[in-house]
Swiss-Prot record:
Source species, domain of life: Bacteria
Sorted UniProt keywords: Ribonucleoprotein, Ribosomal protein
Organism: Salinispora tropica (strain ATCC BAA-916 / DSM 44818 / JCM 13857 / NBRC 105044 / CNB-440)
Recorded family membership: Belongs to the bacterial ribosomal protein bL33 family.
Pfam families listed in its UniProt record: Ribosomal_L33
Protein name: Large ribosomal subunit protein bL33A
Length: 55
């Protein structure tokens, strides 16, 4: 089993456009201790929007 304080946990990125679309990725806690924000494509609104880490 994985440790609770895994260095690279799996995080869910949720669209800020309000569509409910999500990406699943991993992040390195040592390099990115804050919540992750990436600009990615949301196919529901057909444009690039910010995706924020949802906990």
């Amino acid at each position: 089993m994985a440790r609770q304080t895994d260095v690279r946990p799996i995080v869910r990125l949720r669209s800020t456009a309000g569509t409910g679309y999500t990406y699943v990725t991993r992040k390195n806690r040592r390099n990115d201790p804050d919540r992750l924000v990436l600009r990615k494509y949301d196919p529901i609104v057909r444009q690039h929007v910010e995706f924020r880490e949802a906990r």
